[in-house]
A protein has these predicted regions:
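Short loop/turn segments at secondary-structure transitions that flank enzyme active sites
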Residues: 22, 30, 94, 260-262
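Glycine-rich ThDP/TPP pyrophosphate-binding loop and its adjacent helix/strand module
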Residues: 132-309
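Alpha-helix initiation and N-capping motif
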Residues: 9, 21, 58, 85, ...
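Structured loops at beta-to-helix junctions and adjacent beta-edge loops in soluble globular domains
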Residues: 27, 80-82, 91, 199, ...
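Cofactor-binding active-site loop characterized by glycine-rich and histidine/acidic residues
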Residues: 31-188
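Cofactor-/ligand-binding subdomain signature composed of acidic, glycine-rich
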Residues: 1-51
């Protein structure tokens, strides 16, 4: 084991598992939020809205960054793929940030029910990050602006470190790819650091992303051309992620590899939005959803939250 301890790694994994569960629950459930009985058609929301495919990768990035920078008060995380809002919401609930602006978002059964039922719900929470989301400076519904915002935040603030998660589909936008040129503006001691993280999960909404089609060598050379040092990360290996964050290199650019929709019943582009279309009326899909939810061991969630978070 590296300098990162076994207990740290296990806590990272636990957090990812809990947040993945909360994402699925937000997308599908209007009742029985912790699976305290068998799932029924009446537990499923009448209209399913949202995006599952990017959520696991967001949870992986958030948990690992949280562990690495937990004592750094000048660290900021910017989420590019705002359509992965269920993941951001889950993490804000666990960290108590949502509670600061919404007293119903408690870290218990009641709070979990609250965020899940009200996701994509009338007078509830939106399907994408919004100005009402605590700490948000990038909405993320229209992709491409996260990197530019990160560099703007770093300019003139030498104390700041900003990690920005960019989707591989997002990096195809003109604004995002051109924003990599802004790295040169950070030269000198009067500016902060920007840590780009490319979430390479392979697919956008309907096809493989351009960057997923490139070989590792091609992608690395592209990144080097913008003045960065590329660092590959296996998204399913928390120790590897922590080791990558601990590397001392000039202008790191992290490439986080995950499988789109990891953990769900369908992978690749089919999982970009809602991977199960009819669990409210289809018995087989309802069973698939129940098995999917059970894979995260929901019976342990309240105990883990009570022991590790306050």
């Amino acid at each position: 084991m590296s300098a990162v301890g076994i207990a740290e790694i296990e806590k990272i994994k636990q957090r990812i598992r809990i947040c993945d569960y909360l994402c699925v629950a937000q997308l599908f459930l209007q009742d029985n939020f912790l699976l305290e009985r068998s799932l029924e058609f009446s537990d499923i929301k009448p209209r399913l809205l949202g995006h599952w495919g990017t959520c696991h990768g967001i949870n992986v990035a958030y948990a690992n960054l949280k562990n690495h920078f937990q004592k750094n008060q000048n660290f900021t995380f910017i989420l590019g793929p705002g359509h992965g809002f269920p993941a951001l919401q889950a993490n804000l609930l666990i960290d108590g940030e949502l509670l600061k602006v919404d007293k119903k978002a408690t870290l218990d059964k009641s709070g979990i029910e609250y965020i899940c039922k009200r996701f994509s719900w009338p007078d509830g929470f939106p399907s994408h990050a919004s100005p009402l989301t605590p700490g948000i400076i990038t909405e993320g519904g229209e992709l491409g602006y996260a990197l530019a915002n990160a560099y703007g935040l770093a300019l003139g603030h030498p104390e700041k470190t900003i990690a920005v998660l960019i989707g591989d589909g997002e990096l195809e936008t003109a604004t995002a790819i051109d924003s990599l040129n802004l790295q040169g503006l950070l030269a000198g001691s009067n500016n902060g650091k920007v840590l780009p993280i490319l979430h390479l999960n392979g697919y956008k909404i309907s096809a493989p992303s351009i960057y997923a089609r490139k070989s590792e060598r091609e992608l690395n050379e592209l990144i080097r051309g913008f003045g960065f040092t590329p660092i590959m990360i296996n998204g399913e290996d928390a120790e590897n992620f922590q080791e990558a964050l601990n590397k001392k290199v000039e202008a790191p650019f992290y490439i986080l590899k995950t499988e789109k929709g990891s953990g769900g019943p369908n992978s690749h582009h089919e999982s970009h939005q809602i991977p199960l279309k009819n669990p409210k009326t289809d018995e087989e899909e309802l069973k698939q959803l129940e098995e999917w939810l059970k894979s995260y061991q929901p019976e342990e969630i309240l105990t883990i939250l009570g022991e590790n978070y306050d």
